């Protein structure tokens, strides 16, 4: 690596450090750390152990980020000093050492950026992903099955395990709805980027006139919540139906009514589960999904209230169109939130989603 290349790399990393500093609000972080430390000094701090542990976890999280950022700043400064020394006098050993340090430093920056991108409370959790085709019958239902395959392929590439919790086949092709449980570290953190409406433009294989069609599928993503999340569900608020589980193609895969449809009457939320042969296990999974949806609804209502207080006209929920997949008259996939796009539509449909997901997550750091 020539000195000019080393200088260019250090200029790039310096800009990244500057961007991190701009997005982290270190002054507010220092104030919050001090507040939390004051709470920990209170003689009654351990009276509520659960609350105390939350304070400790929050404090540790802020401290870890704060210290990691300052370590990056110090390393940047140290390497810039080494570069100045090399400009004054050539030193092969020092230059070789600096090249190694820069490579290691860039990897550390990437790790730090990933931690910033996946720092929300439930990012580490498994994800529940639902696909719901919009109006348009067979065309949109087929688009749903294409997205199902895309997410299955993406999950395989990440080494995540996929469980089909519910599958409702389309009338002629595709799906009416699908619910997946995607298991893996940070599955929700990544897949929350996919929440929204996905739009397809193509020449329909179901239209004998060969006309161009536009189809929509909504993707909903929720974290699978731990059992320690307290959500009260009263028995009298539930309507539970059972039916025979069906697989792809509509065939019955069980001879007993093991599939469960659970309706929460006050909220109107409906969940279904047919992944297990046992009705009892399907009930347990359906209840878990229901609690997750009720928790999500509660959080979204809080966000709406905050948005109203701030005067924000921000739409909360899955109703907004986030990405377009155009097969005709040209090939392009474009994310409307980040403007990231690619012409390699086949790679995307084969599960190459990381660039779209990372672009979205990076946009949220600031």
Curated annotation (Swiss-Prot):
UniProt modified residues of type N5-methylglutamine: 251
Primary localization: cytoplasm
InterPro entries reported for this sequence: PCRF (IPR005139), Pep_chain_release_fac_I (IPR000352), Pep_chain_release_fac_I_sf (IPR045853), PrfB (IPR004374)
Keyword ATP-binding: no
Keyword Protein biosynthesis attached: yes
Pfam family, one: PCRF
GO cellular component, as recorded: cytoplasm
Intracellular or extracellular location(s): Cytoplasm
Modification after translation, per record: Methylated by PrmC. Methylation increases the termination efficiency of RF2.
Key words, A-Z: Cytoplasm, Methylation, Protein biosynthesis
GO BP annotations listed: viral translational frameshifting
MF-aspect GO terms: translation release factor activity, codon specific
Stored SUPFAM superfamilies: Release factor
Other noteworthy facts: The gene for this protein contains a UGA in-frame termination codon after Leu-24; a naturally occurring frameshift enables complete translation of RF-2. This provides a mechanism for the protein to regulate its own production.
Family stated for the protein in its record: Belongs to the prokaryotic/mitochondrial release factor family.
Primary role: Peptide chain release factor 2 directs the termination of translation in response to the peptide chain termination codons UGA and UAA.
Protein name: Peptide chain release factor 2
Gene it is expressed from: prfB
């Amino acid at each position: 690596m020539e000195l000019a290349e080393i200088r260019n790399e250090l200029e790039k990393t310096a800009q990244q450090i500057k961007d991190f500093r701009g997005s982290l609000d270190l002054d507010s972080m220092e104030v919050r750390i001090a507040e939390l430390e004051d709470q920990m000094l209170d003689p009654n701090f351990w009276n509520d152990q659960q609350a105390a542990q939350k304070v400790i976890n929050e404090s540790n999280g802020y401290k870890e980020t704060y210290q990691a950022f300052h370590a990056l700043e110090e390393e940047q400064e140290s390497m810039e000093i080494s570069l100045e020394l090399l400009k004054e006098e050539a030193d092969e050993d020092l230059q070789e050492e600096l090249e190694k340090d820069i490579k290691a430093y860039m990897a550390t920056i990437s790790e730090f950026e990933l931690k910033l991108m996946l720092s929300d409370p439930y990012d580490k959790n498994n994800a529940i992903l639902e696909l719901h085709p919009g109006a348009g019958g067979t065309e949109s239902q087929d688009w749903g099955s294409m997205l199902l395959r895309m997410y299955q392929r993406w999950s395989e590439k990440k080494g995540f395990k996929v469980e089909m919790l519910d599958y409702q086949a389309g009338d002629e092709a595709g799906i009416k709805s699908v619910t997946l449980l995607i298991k893996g570290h940070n599955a929700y953190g990544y897949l929350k980027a996919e929440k929204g409406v996905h739009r397809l433009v193509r020449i329909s294989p179901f239209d004998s006139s060969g006309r161009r069609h536009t189809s929509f599928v909504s993707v909903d993503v929720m974290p699978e919540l731990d059992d320690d999340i307290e959500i009260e569900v009263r028995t009298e608020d539930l309507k539970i139906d059972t039916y025979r589980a069906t697989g792809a193609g509509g065939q019955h895969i069980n001879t007993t009514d093991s599939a469960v449809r659970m309706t929460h009457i006050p909220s109107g939320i409906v969940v279904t589960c047919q992944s297990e042969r046992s009705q009892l296990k399907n009930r347990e999974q359906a209840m878990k999904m229901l609690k997750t949806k009720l928790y999500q609804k509660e959080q979204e209502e809080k966000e709406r209230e905050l948005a109203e207080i701030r005067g924000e006209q921000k739409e909360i929920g899955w109703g907004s169109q986030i990405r377009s997949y155009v097969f005709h008259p040209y090939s392009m996939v474009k994310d409307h939130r980040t403007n990231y796009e690619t012409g390699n539509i086949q790679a995307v449909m084969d599960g190459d989603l990381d660039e779209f997901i990372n672009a979205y997550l990076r946009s949220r750091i600031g």
